Amino acid sequence: MNPNCARCGKIVYPTEKVNCLDKFWHKACFHCETCKMTLNMKNYKGYEKKPYCNAHYPKQSFTMVADTPENLRLKQQSELQSQVRYKEEFEKNKGKGFSVVADTPELQRIKKTQDQISNIKYHEEFEKSRMGPSGGEGMEPERRDSQDSSSYRRPLEQQQPHHIPTSAPVYQQPQQQPVAQSYGGYKEPAAPVSIQRSAPGGGGKRYRAVYDYSAADEDEVSFQDGDTIVNVQQIDDGWMYGTVERTGDTGMLPANYVEAI
């Protein structure tokens, strides 16, 4: 059913209907109340559900109120009520010992940091109480982890001491005596000979390193992945004795870090 126009009261058909200010209007009836200028949805202004143009839109004016005794009494009463409420709120929060603080991002960050610190301290105290006061069990977790890793890396070193076999060849380069040359009656002093460590020959068993290894003691040798170890002798199931061909160093090496060639 088609509605009636809010101004002329006639039926408004969909082709000329304007729905605005909770009413239905003809396009021609939708005009300013003062100057009768036709309006649309973009330039109208509503006041008390009536359309106005921008020039004739009613402006609100404020009226002055005289300071009569009655108005002064109401003003004083409202001030007293506000003071009473303020004192009530103050008395309620007086015994609580805190003041209301705005929840700013900086305070949230500080609160989060304090929570993390308290959690860390709680876990530290818990670990200390769980480990007990004994020397072995009261050890810090970092020291325990380092000792566990070292004992895992060298399980056989704690059981059997290192013994360098007497049959292991020791390579020494013979030192050449400097020869002095003489020219007539003058004798030229001999130049010093620099002694260099030479890599041993390729005799005996040969192995290839499959991992990098850094020497933990003075009687061990360091090597890299792919290095060749020559003159290898088996000491036990976990350790060998040989010479790194690249560096010429001789000493102990773990058997599970190399493979036979």
Curated annotation (Swiss-Prot):
N6-acetyllysine: modified positions: 42
InterPro entries noted in UniProt: Lasp1_SH3, LIM-SH3_domain_protein, Nebulin_repeat, SH3-like_dom_sf, SH3_domain, Znf_LIM
Renumbered residue ranges of the record's region Disordered: 111-186
Residue spans of the Nebulin repeats: 61-95, 97-131
Biased composition (Basic and acidic residues): 121-130
SUPFAM superfamilies per record: Glucocorticoid receptor-like (DNA-binding domain) (SSF57716), SH3-domain (SSF50044)
Sequence positions bearing Phosphothreonine: 68, 104
Any one GO biological process: monoatomic ion transport
GO cellular component: cell cortex; cytoskeleton; focal adhesion
Ranges of residues in domain SH3: 202-261
PTM comment, free text: Phosphorylated.
Keyword Cytoplasm: yes
Modified residues (N6-succinyllysine): 112
Stretches assigned to the LIM zinc-binding domain: 5-56
Modified-residue entries (Phosphoserine), positions: 99, 118, 134, 146
List of residues that carry N6-methyllysine: 75
Molecular function as annotated in GO: actin filament binding; metal ion binding
Residues that bear N-acetylmethionine: 1
Localization per Swiss-Prot or TrEMBL: Cytoplasm, Cell cortex; Cytoplasm, Cytoskeleton
Stretches with biased composition (Low complexity): 167-183
Record keywords: Acetylation, Actin-binding, Cytoplasm, Cytoskeleton, Ion transport, LIM domain, Metal-binding, Methylation, Phosphoprotein, Repeat, SH3 domain, Transport, Zinc
Self-association and partners: Interacts with F-actin. Interacts with ANKRD54. Interacts with KBTBD10.
Function description: Plays an important role in the regulation of dynamic actin-based, cytoskeletal activities. Agonist-dependent changes in LASP1 phosphorylation may also serve to regulate actin-associated ion transport activities, not only in the parietal cell but also in certain other F-actin-rich secretory epithelial cell types.
Alphabetized PANTHER family for the sequence: LASP, LIM AND SH3 DOMAIN PROTEIN 1
Protein's name in the database: LIM and SH3 domain protein 1
The organism of origin for this protein: Pongo abelii (Sumatran orangutan)
